[in-house]
């Protein structure tokens, strides 16, 4: 092998056994290896999967790099297999040995040091092998600031991942890795650290999620052959240790702050599946309802359909409600291969910010009940959430304002605006069991129903079938702020809104002789529809935005 040749070796683990092979030149053992074109993460993953004959339906959990060799540049990677393979791709017989059994064998000189490390009784002995152990450790962090946890200042405060690094590297003493299995494989628990912001309003302060919860990166080629229960999303995130810290007053975003003062406020196990650990602290458990799980699975199916059809370049966060596919990378420009070889923007699964806020408010506020528009959750087994909600409005299509008001036995007040009239009627169609929140800039309203969290509700007025006003999505911010924004970053408010937002649009047609005439007898409800901006239209909006900024 030339000096420039590169190779990787697999320290492959299945429970208490490790994968070894016999050297063709002697009776000594070695760790299986394969040549790689580069030490880039995708090349390493592809090579190890080929070596260990991992198919698209089987997830090889590749953990951290353990060591680097000298002459031939082998790099050792800890891997976790779903099952014990019998043969490698090159035909070599697989030998599975415990640490004690490994000690009775001779090893090739190149692998002797690594074998000694693996045979050590302390090798990869995590104290967090159960969900209970992870949770108890997480609970001990509640009430502490990041400064109190990382009192030696080992983590860089300027790093965007500083809070997560402090919890993972310092508090849990967990090494940095990019593993496709959960962070604590034996416990099947993924660790996530997420901010809480305080939102002030006339009704008093309330806690909101500071951002979406970004989960694992989507491998389009692999995910195209999976179903929900075999997907990387399910394997990685079935159980999430969610640790949340108080960050800031939401309106103070952008001001200088000392991240070391962030304080851990909550620690919960977000469980999407059942588990049996009788000593687990039940007050730390967040179990998702059947309805929520069905909505998450529907969202996954929506994303999956685009992946299967090699249309990942058309994905946006706005097309789903709870689980979404968000852009991945510092400038949102990274590309990943689809199953047909075409490249699309790299994306990761994420829980939307509105869903995270809804979860948070279940235990951070005194109000624990949320209105649901879906009365029979069995409907979600064969119908989309959107279609069920639209059923509330379909019976009123084609009816005038007066007819709708008469059906609900009320009279439309004469001293309210047309927009107020519109939403009053919408509220009655929904059964008058939701509350309406109005945007300060009058851009949209939102309903507090569980299924409409995070959805912007807009009206589209027509005059004899033609739009009578523009579809306003956002007020123009301060111009000095605008010129400092960059489209492909999180600080571009318009891009974030178009990429992440789903709208519920109500169409009303004014059939009066004069557009200013608001006689309710001649204004008709034409219907409702959910809408998000397609990726192709977002690209057009980008060009217009850049021209305006320049």
Question: What does each model-identified segment do?
Answer:
Residues 26-29, 76-78, 86-126:
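Nudix hydrolase/Nudix homology domain
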């Amino acid at each position: 092998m030339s000096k420039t040749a590169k190779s990787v070796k697999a320290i492959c683990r299945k429970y208490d056994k490790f994968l070894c092979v016999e050297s063709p030149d002697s009776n000594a053992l070695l760790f299986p290896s394969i040549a790689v074109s580069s030490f880039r993460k995708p090349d390493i993953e592809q090579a190890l999967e080929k070596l260990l004959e991992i198919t698209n339906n089987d997830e090889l959990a590749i953990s951290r790099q353990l060591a680097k060799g000298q002459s031939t540049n082998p790099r050792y990677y800890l891997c976790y297999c779903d099952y014990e393979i019998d043969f490698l791709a090159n035909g070599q017989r697989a030998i599975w040995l415990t640490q004690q059994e490994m000690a009775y064998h001779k090893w090739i000189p190149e692998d002797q040091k690594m074998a000694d490390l693996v045979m050590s009784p302390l090798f990869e002995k995590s104290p967090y092998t159960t969900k209970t152990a992870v949770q108890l450790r997480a609970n001990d962090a509640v009430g502490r600031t990041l400064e109190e946890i990382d009192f030696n200042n080992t983590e860089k405060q300027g790093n965007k991942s500083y809070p997560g690094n402090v919890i993972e590297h310092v508090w849990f003493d967990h090494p940095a890795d990019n593993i496709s299995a959960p962070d604590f494989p034996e416990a099947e628990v993924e660790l996530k650290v997420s901010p809480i912001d305080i939102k002030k309003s006339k009704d008093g302060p309330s806690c909101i999620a500071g951002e979406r919860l970004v989960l694992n990166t989507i491998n389009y080629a692999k995910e195209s052959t999976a179903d929900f229960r075999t997907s990387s999303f399910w394997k990685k995130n079935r159980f999430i240790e969610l640790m949340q810290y108080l960050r800031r007053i939401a309106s103070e975003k952008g001001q200088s702050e000392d991240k070391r003062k962030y304080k851990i406020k909550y620690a919960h196990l977000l469980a999407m599946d059942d588990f049996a650990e009788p000593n687990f602290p039940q007050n730390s458990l967040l179990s998702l309802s059947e309805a929520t799980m069905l909505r998450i699975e529907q969202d996954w199916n929506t994303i999956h359909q685009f992946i299967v059809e090699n249309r990942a370049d058309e994905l946006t966060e706005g097309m789903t409600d709870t689980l979404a596919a968000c852009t991945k990378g510092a400038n949102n420009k990274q590309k990943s291969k689809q199953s047909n070889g075409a490249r699309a923007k790299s994306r990761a699964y994420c829980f939307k910010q509105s869903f995270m806020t809804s979860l948070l408010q279940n235990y951070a506020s005194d109000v624990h009940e949320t209105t649901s528009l879906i009365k029979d959750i069995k409907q979600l087994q064969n119908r989309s959430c959107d279609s069920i909600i639209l059923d509330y409005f379909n019976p009123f299509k084609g009816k005038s304002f007066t007819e709708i008001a008469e059906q609900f036995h009320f009279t439309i007040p004469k001293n309210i605006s047309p927009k107020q009239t519109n939403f009053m009627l919408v509220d009655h169609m929904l059964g008058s069991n939701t509350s309406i929140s109005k945007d300060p800039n009058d851009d949209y309203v939102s309903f507090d129903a569980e299924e409409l969290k995070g959805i912007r509700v807009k009206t589209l007025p027509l005059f004899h079938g033609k739009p009578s006003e523009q579809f306003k999505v956002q007020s123009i911010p301060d111009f000095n702020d605008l010129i400092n924004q960059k489209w492909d970053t999180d600080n571009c408010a318009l891009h974030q809104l178009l990429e992440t937002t789903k709208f519920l649009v109500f169409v009303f047609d004014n059939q009066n002789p004069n557009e200013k005439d608001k006689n309710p007898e001649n204004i008709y409800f034409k219907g409702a529809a959910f809408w998000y901006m397609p990726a192709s239209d977002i690209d057009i909006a980008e060009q217009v935005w850049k021209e305006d900024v320049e």
